[in-house]
Amino acid sequence: MKGGKSKGESKKAETKLAVNKKGAAATKGGKKPAKGKEPKDPNKPKRPPSAFFVFMADFREQYKKDHPNNKSVAAVGKACGEEWKSLSEEEKAPYVDRALKKKEEYEITLQAYNKKLEGKDDEEGSDKSKSEVNDEDEDEEDEEDEDDD
């Protein structure tokens, strides 16, 4: 057999293909969803911005006024980062204070959100238990009906 492959060669080729397929899926960004991970709640309050992000919001507005033709997000981010690094601690202080205030507000809203969740969980848990009890009663009645036949 001039052009044919031996059994050993074909098995090697198959295992190489299998390895490549596994590797290709991982490299193409085909992430598997995490098992047991709950989906994010859209009603949950967002985390507060850090001092840098508070600064960046102000800087972005000023940068757009000074450079109206610049549409590059990367350029704005780079300029902002360089400006932030050049600031002294005294110059950063107002942004740190604003970030702390936002963090305190976040903690208050998060506590309120968690209280709402606890209330919903208690109500849902009692509803579920009632329905489960009702389902069990119905099942027992069905079994009794079958015994009568």
From Swiss-Prot:
Please name the GO terms that the record assigns under molecular function: chromatin binding; DNA binding; structural constituent of chromatin
What keyword terms does UniProt attach to this protein?
DNA-binding, Nucleus
**What broad class describes the main subcellular location of this protein?**
nucleus
Give start-end positions of Basic and acidic residues composition bias: 1-15, 35-44
A single GO BP term for this record reads: chromatin organization
Q: Which subcellular locations apply to this protein?
A: Nucleus
Comp. bias (Acidic residues): 134-149
Disordered: region residues: 1-52, 112-149
Q: Name one GO cellular component term.
A: nucleus
Residue numbers of the DNA-binding region are 45-114
Q: Which CDD domains match?
A: HMG-box_AtHMGB1-like
What is the annotated signal peptide range for this record? Answer: none
Family the entry assigns: Belongs to the HMGB family.
> What is the name attached to this protein's record?
HMG1/2-like protein
